[in-house]
Amino acid sequence: MNRYFVFSDVHGEYYALADALREAGYDPNNPKHVLVSLGDNFDRGTNSLDVYTLLAHNKQNICIKGNHETFLEEALEKGIDGEFVFFNILHNGLLETIQSFAYANMKKTISVAQIQAYINAINESWNQLLPWLKKMPLYFETKNYFFCHAGVNPNIYPTLPDEHFMLWDIEYSHVPIHSSNKTFVIGHHHAFRVKEKAEQAGYTTTKPKVHWVGNEDENGPVMIGNKIAIDPCSNLTHKVNVLVIDDEPLEEPPKETTEKPQDKVYISSNQDNKYTINVARSIDPNDITFEINRDLYNPNITFGAYVNHENIR
C-alpha cells in the first residue's frame, strides 16, 4: 500500500506546494510516499525551477504531462522559432519559466535574440530537463484511481482519447465516468468552474471523501460522482490542493539502486521564514538527496536539498 500525494497546476508556486505537502504529512524519506503531479507545474509563477528540482530528484515521483509542459518542451526543442513559443511567452507565462531556469531577471521588452540565448543556456545547464519532459506519461493508474491532466472522454472510456484531449479538454471535466468503478482525478480546469458546470448540468457536487489540504473555499477540490477536480487556481489563491490517497499500485515498482551522491553542492537559505532550494547548475536534479529537517545550519528549514551533507563545512 502506497500513500499518494496528488496535486495539479502548481504553475511555479513552489512555496504553496511545499506548504501543502508539509501540512499533508509528506515524508520524502518514506519509500511508500509518492508524489503524483497531474501536470502544469510551470509558467506564470516565479519558482518553476524549484518545482522541477522537487519533482525530478526522485524517480519514484509520478509526473503526468499537462499542456504547459508541452509549452516548455516546444521552447527547448525548437527555440523561439517554435510555432507557439512566442505566443506562450507573451500570454501563458512561459517567460517566467525561462527566467527561473536561466537565473535571469528579464523584462517583457527583452529581445528575441536574448530569449533564444536563455533557452540555449537552459538546454546546456539543465540537459536532463527536455528528456524528462518528453518521457512524461499522459496518465497514471493505481488499483482504484486514474490520474490525468484534463481527463478522458466518458463516452468512449476505457478507450483512451488522443493526446490533445487528455491535455486540453474542458468539455467533459464535470462529467463522471459511469463505465468505470475507479475514481478519476483531474486538473487543468479550475475546480470552481468544474463545480459550476456540474451543478448547472444537474450533478451533485461534494468534497472528496479522502483526506486533502489546500483551499477551503470554492477553489478547493470538488467531487462529482467518481471524478475529483483539484485545479486550485494557484496563481490567484497562492495555494495548492493536495489529495492524500492510500492505494495499491497496479504493479510492483522497480527497486531503487543506492548510488553514492556527488560531492558537496548544497546551499539552503531561510529568508522571512521562506524555504528555498538552491542547487548549482552542474548537478543533475536526479542525483540530489532530498530530506526534511536535516539542514546543518538552520533546523527550521522544512525542506533541504543536498548532494552530500557530510562534506559540508
What are these regions (language model features)?
Residues 1-8, 16, 20, 29, ...:
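Extended recognition/assembly regions associated with phosphoester-bond processing machinery
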